Amino acid sequence: MSQDLIETTATTTKIVEARELGHQIHDSLLEQLKLQQEELLQQQRDLFFQEQQLQLQQQVTQPVSNNGNTWSFTQGLVIGQVSVIFIIIVFVKFFVFADSSSHIPTKPGLDGATGVIVKRNKNKKHSNGQFANDGENEDDTSLDSNQSKISSILEKTYYDVNNHASESLDWFNVLVAQTISQLRSEALLKDNIYHSLNNFLTNAKLPDFIDTINLTEIDIGDDFPIFSNCRIKYGEDLKRLEAKIDVDLSDTLTLGIATKLLLNQPRPLTAVLPVSLTVSIVRFSGCLTVSLINTKDIDLKNVDKTSNMNGYSKENANGDGASSSNNDEDEDDGGTALMFSFSPDYRLEFIVKSLIGSRAKLQDVPKISSLIENQLRTWFIERCVEPRFQVVRLPSLWPRTKNTREPVTKKTTTTPSTTVNGTSAATITTPGEYVNSNI
């Protein structure tokens, strides 16, 4: 028992000693914390005093800087107000109120256009001693300006004349086919081709040995031309761009006529020889050159004058001189025109059938076939084969009210019902698909 008591007392003393040791450690830690807090407070006081000193120094130097800032702000405010007032005065004077000199009446026409159209190269001046070289300088200047315009167009449209691939023109073939199909339908329904050709042959001046010409056959075909391999190239004069397009047409276009050859010697109608001819175009292929030009182009006028002087134009001998002069007057008015021609390596195939005689008939005489074919080729070459070309004036593309249309939805309207034989009936009307919006 005594040993147990000794052990318990020993453990008790150890516990007491441990507690005292813990209290001592706690007290020491508290003292260390207090010391650290005092040090932190002292540091904060020092920092506070330093900040106060800095603020005092700033307050001492601030009045001088405030005076400078206030003066610069005042200057900026005054200058800004003055500039705004000056801008308002200038705007009111030059933009609101018109100049008194502008009210002086001027002649209409070119004087009014010169103030609207922007002119380039106004600083170019020519002395009196340069009149001999004015023509050459103007030609060189116009050539350079045209080349610069063409280069600008090609650059802005991303088209390389030398390396761009050719186009198929499938979409264009569809549009042309629709147009030709519509024209054929109108020709079949209205017989306008027959009537126009018949009137032309009836009113034509024929020699005394040819009787009246009658139409026997007209075939407008059922196929369509195919345009392909389109490429843009420079013209020979480098003043414009040309579109080279391959054209191929395999169809049968036929015109048949019947007439009589009259022998009026030694007396009128001594003999009569019936003649029947049928000409068919079965194949055409070639390279079509298309370009847009101005009808006031100097080169165009020179070509026309040269062709007239050399006797290329035979239309004047046939009584078309008045129409050609009228066309020249129209071209002098200016405007855009479509110029097209075919290359000399075209392919044109004919089938000519002839029947001569009444009882003993001669069929398909080769001499007659070659004569007619040569005449047709000559007619085509003189009008459409390079270096000759056709010029078609383009209409104005400005939108006009008289050309405006709008689709109309089909609506059914019923009139009041009427009684017929004991049954009621109503009249149904539908308006047209398109109406003219020009009122």
Curated annotation (Swiss-Prot):
GO terms for biological process: aminophospholipid transport; intermembrane lipid transfer; mitochondrial genome maintenance; mitochondrion-endoplasmic reticulum membrane tethering; protein insertion into mitochondrial outer membrane. Keywords: Endoplasmic reticulum, Lipid transport, Lipid-binding, Membrane, Transmembrane, Transmembrane helix, Transport. Disulfide bonds: none annotated. Belongs to the MMM1 family. This is Maintenance of mitochondrial morphology protein 1. It is a single-pass type I membrane protein. Residues 125-145, 309-336, 405-425 are annotated as: Disordered. The gene is MMM1. Its main location: endoplasmic reticulum. The chain crosses the membrane at residues 77-97. Homodimer. Component of the ER-mitochondria encounter structure (ERMES) or MDM complex, composed of MMM1, MDM10, MDM12 and MDM34. A MMM1 homodimer associates with one molecule of MDM12 on each side in a pairwise head-to-tail manner, and the SMP-LTD domains of MMM1 and MDM12 generate a continuous hydrophobic tunnel for phospholipid trafficking. GO terms for cellular component: endoplasmic reticulum; endoplasmic reticulum membrane; ERMES complex. Pfam families: MMM1. Residues 98-439 are cytoplasmic. CDD domains: SMP_Mmm1. Component of the ERMES/MDM complex, which serves as a molecular tether to connect the endoplasmic reticulum (ER) and mitochondria. Components of this complex are involved in the control of mitochondrial shape and protein biogenesis, and function in nonvesicular lipid trafficking between the ER and mitochondria. The MDM12-MMM1 subcomplex functions in the major beta-barrel assembly pathway that is responsible for biogenesis of all outer membrane beta-barrel proteins, and acts in a late step after the SAM complex. One of its GO terms (molecular function) is lipid binding. It is found in: Endoplasmic reticulum membrane. Residues 315-326, 410-424 have a biased composition (Low complexity). The SMP-LTD domain is a barrel-like domain that can bind various types of glycerophospholipids in its interior and mediate their transfer between two adjacent bilayers. Residues 165-395 form the SMP-LTD domain. It comes from Candida albicans (strain SC5314 / ATCC MYA-2876) (Yeast). Residues 1-76 are lumenal.
